[in-house]
Amino acid sequence: MKQRSVVPAFVLGLLVLLGTLATPGLAAKGGQGKKPGAKAMTFEVCKHGCRYRTIQKAVDAAGSFKAKKRNAKVKTVVAIRPGKYVEGVVVDGTLRKKRFDGLTIKGTKKNRKKVVLEGRNAKGELGAAQNGIEAISVDGLVLENMWARNYQSNGFFVHAATDGTQHCDGYRMDNLLASANRSYGLFAKGCLGGKMLDSAGFHHGDSAFYVGETPCDRKTWTNHGTAPPPGPCQRKPQWTLLKNLRSYENVLGYSGTNSKYVKIVESAFYNNGAGIVPNTLDSEGFEPNGWNLFERNDVFWNNYNYFLAGAKFRTVSGGLGQVGGATVNYPTGVGIVLYGGANNVVKRNNVFGNYKWGIASFSGPGEIFVANEGDDAKSINNQIVENAMGRGGADPNGEYDFWNDATGGGNCWADNGPASFAPGNGKVPLSEIYPGCPQTEVLADQVRSLDIEAGLQINFADTADPRTILGYATSNPPQNQECSWVRRVAPHPAFEKFVPVEVAPQPGEVSC
């Protein structure tokens, strides 16, 4: 009897040993297991051999795991092996018995093209999948090493819910690629702080990168008032950083409706309809856009006329609205557009080869012909300084390097080197339209969003005058905007390894 008992004990010990040795192998095949005291839990996704074959199922499992009290401090990671995943992933932080804060979703390879989220034929709860990954009210989300393409709305979308407890703070999007999504590539809305890093986007019906509707400390915040000055949107600003991005062949390279505290640095915006375009619109909360920094970017060759039949993508917008019965569109052929912005700093950028204007700034009128219902889109207190325009004459911008509509106040231009300035009708001196720095800051209600004297915002004798912003933006048909483009050099001189891309009109498509 004693001799028989030795064999089972030996076998049992061997099995325990083998089980211990096998644990890493199970993880490698997509198993999930957490050692006591572990600081991270990984949920692996792959087409064959993993526990999870879809990203959504792994995300759901991670959310359920994190929701358990004993796992609250454990980091959760969804690791996706190379492959094409035809699905739309939703990370819903409002769900009960799920917790997604701090979740990382990443491709296992540094080559972001190895993990493809495919929108064509992807299904969602209500039909076609709208987004590659959509995260709702999740703090600290990390998205890395993926490519999202062909979705009905957006590639990667993080936003706050609208239930009064909204939050989506501190996200990080890193080494992502987005292409051919109907609206946006990397899209953040209603968030406090975040990062978009080392990523690229092309062929979007709005913009490759978007940060919008930055929330303020109070939902009732406004920059209206004359005395005393209104307080800041955020007393302790939480900044969003966009760095080392490549945005090309989109309607807009960057769009930021009512965005605030955004830094865009060391990035390239080229071959878009327009390059960097922060803007103020009634369509979203917390107007206006402002308090942003755009520094050390290359902004060039933004001459993609996406209104033409030969364009590789279509604008998702039917226009920005109506002014005087005419449809307003974003101006094309422009490097940087400050639309209705306050306290933005445009500094040390390299702006060249844009066929209309290098850097344009203007208000959205809130009176007479109304473009902004609350008169929130006033161009005030912006600084445009130390920019290099036209590559020293080798690749000039088109009509002018700088164009300003003479509205608002407190704006200034300085140390931009040799440059050209749109003069208007000559009734207002250039020194008043483009005053030097510094200037005394103004309050929004001390200045007007309408100017009829300088002939830059509107020409009442010819409302279609393309030298004015309203005449140019209401060109009809819109592809006729290019009728007033000025191509000062042909072809563009080489710049690094970039290649200029434009759309050739078909016979009769542009009527100048």
Give the positions of each predicted feature:
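Bacterial N-terminal signal peptides that target proteins for export
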Residues: 1-11
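Bacterial N-terminal signal peptides
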Residues: 10-20
